[in-house]
Amino acid sequence: MDTPLDELQWKSPEWIQAFGLRTDNVLDYFAESPFFDKTANNHVIKMQRQFSQLPNNGAAAGSMNPETMRDAHSEDMGQEQEFSYVDPIRRAILEKYVVHAFLERELMKVRGIEYVLANVREPDFWVIKKQRRTSPTAIEPLQTYYIVGANVYQSPTVFKIVQSRLLACSSHLSATLAELNNLVEFKPSQGVQYKNILDMPVTTRKTGNTANVGSVPGTISASLNMPMVNTGRLNSAGAATIGTSGVPNSAGMTGANTMATGQTGATSRFENGSSRSSTDAISTDTLDKLLITSMKSTPEYI
């Protein structure tokens, strides 16, 4: 068979339909599977009982009667000492199911490979253990099998369990390293470093700080969050402001108020007829703020 036994699932619905599946005959059902070794002592004992000259019909009938077998074994006061070498779970199984206790006594008489019922969770779960008996009370476990419902499985080895866990860990680590590799960038001035996704790109910050730096003072003030002075006519309250012509207005006409600081200021320096250059239109405070902004900006190396 090319398929490994630990990757094989076996079941026989026909056998279950004919005989049923319960704790008394679960070993007989397991003996039909490819996991069972035909040279095991269980098969030898079964053949001996089948072709024995002893009258086994009555014994077989009695084995199917739990009350009769329980009364027979209740007379055996040394049963606990007889099966003292097995674990408490198996000892409870041998005390409850007389068929398995009879098989255990027969297996104690021979040496070699054998199959025993190790655990029961009725009505649909059994654990069968393959072991090698070296003496009546000394056994060596070899393999474990599970019967879940009608399906029979072989338990995986420790090597394959560890191999599967390591393979899963390495797969997740490879995926993580691939994601981290996408977050690495290289700059000749700074070398290899990780990208900071929360920060804005340098080009965006540069554009936001230095856009529209021209000869129009109002635009410069707006981009630097500084007071922006708009010229216009008098508001309805009659507050005196100086327009673009430099002549105070006294009429109660609506106009644009001074923004950002809530204060009105003279804009005579921005008059149309002024002979001053555009550089003189920027005040000393504005130049200082421009200098501080340029010092705080991130340098870009070429």
Swiss-Prot record:
GO biological process, alphabetically ordered: positive regulation of transcription elongation by RNA polymerase II; positive regulation of transcription initiation by RNA polymerase II; RNA polymerase II preinitiation complex assembly
CC annotations in GO: core mediator complex; mediator complex
Keyword flag Flavoprotein: no
Region feature Disordered, mapped onto this chain: 260-281
InterPro entries per UniProt: Mediator_Med6, Mediator_Med6_fun, Mediator_Med6_sf
Subcellular localization(s) per the UniProt record: Nucleus
Record function comment: Component of the Mediator complex, a coactivator involved in the regulated transcription of nearly all RNA polymerase II-dependent genes. Mediator functions as a bridge to convey information from gene-specific regulatory proteins to the basal RNA polymerase II transcription machinery. Mediator is recruited to promoters by direct interactions with regulatory proteins and serves as a scaffold for the assembly of a functional preinitiation complex with RNA polymerase II and the general transcription factors.
Name the UniProt record assigns to this protein: Mediator of RNA polymerase II transcription subunit 6
Naturally occurring in which organism (per UniProt): Candida glabrata (strain ATCC 2001 / BCRC 20586 / JCM 3761 / NBRC 0622 / NRRL Y-65 / CBS 138)
